């Protein structure tokens, strides 16, 4: 986008590097917020907004990253002044930041998130055009649409857990505290993902009958032991 808009090779490279580091401030965002599979409440939203300032503070202290920090500091601003953290508007937002804002939004829209399915390219472009002059610089949007319409997004682009470490991070939301088995929320999440991917799947349903009676006769601690043992046998 920057190249198409006549920016120098040095500026394009600077913006590219800033794009890689633009969310580095999220290293201080708690997983309970960052990975939450649902809408954030007001406090959580306020806390996640802090990642912009944290990212700027981290990078601006390193001479070779200072220019990148200036770009990153504005990547959640809106063209109409309703963004954060500064409420900057129009040309108060650095030009390279205005490009990053559009590119970042397109990336977010076309990536499968733990809490939200992705849009296809046409849907994302339609939303970007609808927000031209509000969230986005109209001049940037005009060029971005031309570039982004030619992009093909593979189905594999997502933010879903792949490694064992990532799966353990997500366990906060999706594992039962007693048995460590995946819970009903995880089943809902899987079904939602499969519907987005339009891929067939099948499930085995196993019922454990009369657990209430077992708890009544032996106590809930023994009932929990039975549940854990049952889960171990099924894994």
Annotate the PLM regions.
Residues 106, 208-209:
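PAS/PAC or PAS-like capping segment
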Residues 37-41, 172-173, 216:
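A short, mixed-charge helix-start or loop-turn motif at secondary-structure junctions
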Residues 1-165:
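Histidine- and acidic-residue-rich, metal-dependent catalytic cores
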Residues 150-178, 189-193:
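Signal-transducing coiled-coil/dimerization helices and immediately adjacent hinge/linker segments
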Residues 101, 202-204:
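Protein kinase-like catalytic core scaffold
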Residues 174-175, 180-202, 209-234:
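Conserved long alpha-helical elements within nucleotide-processing catalytic cores of c-di-GMP signaling
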Residues 21, 205-208:
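Alpha/beta-hydrolase
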Residues 2-5, 15, 168-176, 181, ...:
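A conserved signal-transducing helical linker
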């Amino acid at each position: 986008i920057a190249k198409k808009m006549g920016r120098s090779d040095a500026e394009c490279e600077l913006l590219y590097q800033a794009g890689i580091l633009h969310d580095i401030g999220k290293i201080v965002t708690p997983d309970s917020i960052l990975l939450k599979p649902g809408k954030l409440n007001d406090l959580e939203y306020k806390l996640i907004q802090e990642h912009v300032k944290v990212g700027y503070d981290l990078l601006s202290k390193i001479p070779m990253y200072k220019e990148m920090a200036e770009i990153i500091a504005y990547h959640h601003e809106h063209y109409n002044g309703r963004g954060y953290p500064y409420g900057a508007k129009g040309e108060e937002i650095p030009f390279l930041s205005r490009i990053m804002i559009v590119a970042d939004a397109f990336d977010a829209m076309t990536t499968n998130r733990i809490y939200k399915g992705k849009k296809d390219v046409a849907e994302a472009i339609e939303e970007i055009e609808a927000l031209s002059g509000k969230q986005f610089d109209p001049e940037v949007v005009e060029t971005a649409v031309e570039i982004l319409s030619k992009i093909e997004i593979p189905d594999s682009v997502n933010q879903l857990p792949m490694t064992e470490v990532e799966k353990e991070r997500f366990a906060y939301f999706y594992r039962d505290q007693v048995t460590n088995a995946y819970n009903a929320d995880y089943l809902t999440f899987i079904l939602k993902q499969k519907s987005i991917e339009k891929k067939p799947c099948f499930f085995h349903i196993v019922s454990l009958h009369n657990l209430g009676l077992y708890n009544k006769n032996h106590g809930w601690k023994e009932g929990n032991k039975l549940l854990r043992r049952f889960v171990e046998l099924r894994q």
